[in-house]
Amino acid sequence: MFKKFDEKESVSNCIQLKTSVIKGIKSQLVEQFPGIEPWLNQIMPKKDPVKIVRCHEHTEILTVSGELLFFRQRKGPFCPTLRLLHKYPFILPHQQVDKGAIKFVLSGANIMCPGLTSPGAKLYPAAVDTIVAVTAEGKQHALCVGVMKMSAEDIEKVNKGIGIENIHYLNDGLWHMKTYK
């Protein structure tokens, strides 16, 4: 999603949100990520300005005080950015890939089923369309944020094809966009 993303070319406008809209977004985030509720006031303080950065391809990025926190496409579910995920790793369920998949994931490739079922990988139960953090064998922080294209049981049974769609990874355009004022 952010492979060819460039801050100067891809951003179309930025809108400061009203408090009523912010409350709606917060309740949507709590519904989507139940573990985030105790930390939500720390992530999104009440007095800090909350803005939506609108980008090409119907992508919206939620920012608080210039810090990029969540993104979504076409009014879909919110996904945390990797910077936020590194601070609060418990927001998303995790899947682990083996060492051989690291360079492909960091170049933006989708995660294939064999990379999730081989020795060194750990596949945790997850349903289709679940947003997950993908970590690597022997690494502490997440490599990418992805969407499960198959359930964990189907990945183990079929062991072919795309298991997780890579939507945001380290060193992509969104990662290089540090803050937005």
Swiss-Prot record:
User: Where is it predominantly found?
Assistant: cytoplasm
What's the further remark here?
Imprinted gene expressed from the paternal allele in fetal spinal cord.
Q: SMART domains from the xrefs?
A: PUA
Signal peptide as annotated in the record: none
The UniProt similarity line reads:
Belongs to the MCTS1 family.
Q: Where in the cell is it found?
A: Cytoplasm
Q: Which GO terms describe its cellular component?
A: cytoplasm
Gene Ontology MF annotations: RNA binding
**Can you give the residue ranges of the PUA domain?**
92-171
Q: What top-level branch of life does the organism fall under?
A: Eukaryota
**Species, as recorded:** Homo sapiens (Human)
Could you tell me which cysteines form disulfide bridges?
A: none
Q: What is one GO biological process annotated to this record?
A: formation of translation preinitiation complex
Q: What is this protein called?
A: Malignant T-cell-amplified sequence 2
Please name the gene that encodes this protein. Answer: MCTS2
